[in-house]
């Protein structure tokens, strides 16, 4: 086998390997439903304060609402500490609430308005300013 034939054989192997890897990758991506992609993108948009929500805490025994928060809020459930962290953005300022959960106190979150997110592609958020820390000298 000449050097040229070896190069051609090596090139064919590389192309075949790349094609198999691409097909496998597309196969894995194809297993994700449109609803899963849209749900993930809605969650990311809400975490970026793009979606208005209503968060209600209620007593499951008395069926009474204890607290209602409305606005562009991000939630972070902390099941270990039995609490929900709620961070809201309002007029460029932020408010943070820590709400305790118990056997009889729970919550639900409602998205108030529809949002236009992709069900084809995952949203990727990259913020270069978050890589470099904001250093304050005292």
UniProtKB/Swiss-Prot annotation:
It comes from Mycobacterium phage D29 (Mycobacteriophage D29). This is Gene 64 protein. It comes from the Viruses.
């Amino acid at each position: 086998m000449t050097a040229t034939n070896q190069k051609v054989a090596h090139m064919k192997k590389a192309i075949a390997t790349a094609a198999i890897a691409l097909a496998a990758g597309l196969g894995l991506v194809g297993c994700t439903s449109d609803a899963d992609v849209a749900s993930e993108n809605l969650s990311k948009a809400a975490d970026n304060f793009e979606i208005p929500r209503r968060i209600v805490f209620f007593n499951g025994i008395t069926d009474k609402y204890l607290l209602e928060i409305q606005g562009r809020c991000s939630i972070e459930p902390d099941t270990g500490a039995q609490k929900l962290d709620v961070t809201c953005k309002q007029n460029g300022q932020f408010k943070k609430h820590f709400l305790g959960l118990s056997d009889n106190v729970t919550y639900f979150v409602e998205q108030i308005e529809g949002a236009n997110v992709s069900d084809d592609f995952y949203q990727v958020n990259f913020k270069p300013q978050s890589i470099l820390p904001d250093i304050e000298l005292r």
